[in-house]
């Protein structure tokens, strides 16, 4: 394999890896890290904007938001939606849970 072919193979592998994204699996749900970041943004907006808040006794307020990412919407059907969203936000901010940091044990 020549140097240019090797270089092309490395570039293709890097592109494939970045296209896959980072997924979080929790209690049977698989969501993208970017979706969890969007969830946090939506919740922050709802907290700062009282007119966006709806009174949802059974569902977290964010479940009523049409901007909620598609991969998070099935969680709203769960009785554990609020605790699942909380756990996903916690996981998304923990580098060892996501195995971003190679120094983390168990990664």
UniProtKB/Swiss-Prot annotation:
Alphabetical list of Gene3D superfamilies matching this protein: Guanylin
Subcellular location: Secreted
Signal peptide residue numbers: 1-21
Keywords: Disulfide bond, Secreted, Signal
InterPro entries, alphabetized: Guanylin, Guanylin_sf
Propeptide part(s) removed at maturation, as residue ranges: 22-92
Family: Belongs to the guanylin family.
A GO CC annotation given for this chain: extracellular region
Intrachain disulfide bonds: 63-76, 96-104, 99-107
Listed GO MF terms: guanylate cyclase activator activity
Keyword Signal included in the entry's annotation: yes
Protein name per Swiss-Prot or TrEMBL: Guanylate cyclase activator 2B
Source organism: Notomys alexis
Function: Endogenous activator of intestinal guanylate cyclase. It stimulates this enzyme through the same receptor binding region as the heat-stable enterotoxins. May be a potent physiological regulator of intestinal fluid and electrolyte transport. May be an autocrine/paracrine regulator of intestinal salt and water transport.
Predominant cellular place of this UniProt entry's protein: secreted
